[in-house]
Amino acid sequence: LIEEIWRILQQRPIQLDSVKQMITQIAVCQANPDIELGVSGQGADRLISSLYGTTQACREDPGVAVYRERLTSMDSGALQYEATGFARAMHDTGLVSPYHAVLLRYLLDHGDHLLSEALGLSSTGRDCLLCYGRLVRAMIGEAVHPQTAQAIYGLALLLERGTLYQPPAAPALWRQLSLPLSPYCQERLALTFGPEPSPRAWLMQGVLCMLGQPLGVGQGNNPTCQSARALSMWAYNDPDYLLQMVVWAARDDEIIIHFEGQPISSRESASGVATEIPLDLDPVSLLVVPHLDRIYAEMGRRCLGREGDPHRWVNPEFHGWWSGRGFRINVDVEPGRLDQLEDFLRHFYAVTDSAARFVGWHAITVLRVTLDPKEVMRVYFFNPNNDSGQNWGNGVEVSTAGNGERFGEASLPFEQFASRLYIFHYDPLERGELAQVGVEELQRVKDQIYQSWGVDRLPADVLQASNGCASPE
């Protein structure tokens, strides 16, 4: 269980409720004299202390009221010691203690230096804090409470990414701080997260976490991966656009996105992919995803009757210009058979090898292609499916740590990744020539497809060849 918790934390998800519940249960077991953990409890202390006993002043988990009282008697040196301890634990684990929130609110009146220490900022983050100190303090005042302590990690990473230096970002966040929430959205937030500290605080916490951890977005137990990918992509590339989506959803209970020049309203659209209203999501996803889901489904309905896969038209309109208008698919949709597989693979090799840049946003997001520490060419990607460490069959196991991954990334060797791909988008103006992939390498990828998800989709020529090889004649 402890190993599983660390594996999940390594991916830095936004939603950590289940992880915190597991850590709390481990702490209860440790405190129970009737339970002997033995060597199985190794590694638990760091997890428990990161939440309930991070520094000397809260080592025995005294409660937030007692800890707040202790802070009033500390000098600047003691406060700095507390700030440094919390920041180190937060960046080591991705977990934030409720006591950390008490400290950060207390430090609002104690200058930028201690705030910077408590957030664990580098020179980049400190500069951003100094430039936008008033905004940062306002966001802490709104979003940071013991119940919403994870907002601290999101805020720290937001500052470290330099997001506030984008001209529209700061005004959009000021707007978010004064955003009136519709009664429906207030009810949804209170129902999911509780009435305390307030629905506005929960939403602001969600905004900070999503902007700071764009690769930590998860779809929950819902078939809404397209919407989750869109939120991640907008948070990663265009925070102002994401914040505008939040405004429309939280204030107006409606989002309008155009499809081929025609507006689609989430309020007027029929049901989406999800048959029930999702509740196991972060605060931003909770409000925005139902609207995006209905719009995405409506775009698909408007493609009925067109030849080919509807993602060709839907994805660029839904996600924005980051999803290229070029489109390749290796399945003939009508019969469901593999189609032009070699050209598909050569094209994918070409558009990824040439620039090692974003490729497309369908299914997962390809972030970069580069050599790993062992000099193996790997594809690093974002998967919104909550836990990226998955087994994709036939020995293809996705890595989330240990092969050069950054927090939130998953990766596979290039050949293995190509063998599981069936659609990608690209920029048609930068396609380049089909890659000169070696025949042996290409055959290895094709064999992996034939032996896994393509086994029931073999085109006629491959079926005949395989049958011929198997025949005793």
Name each model feature, range by range.
Residues 5, 9-12, 26, 30, ...:
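Generic structural signal for hydrophobic core residues of well-folded globular domains
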Residues 1-93:
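N-terminus-biased targeting/localization segments
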Residues 239-251:
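Short, glycine/acidic-rich hinge or "gate" loops at secondary-structure transitions
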Residues 248-356:
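Papain-like cysteine protease catalytic cores
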Residues 107-108:
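Cytosolic terminal low-complexity segments enriched in Ser/Thr and acidic residues
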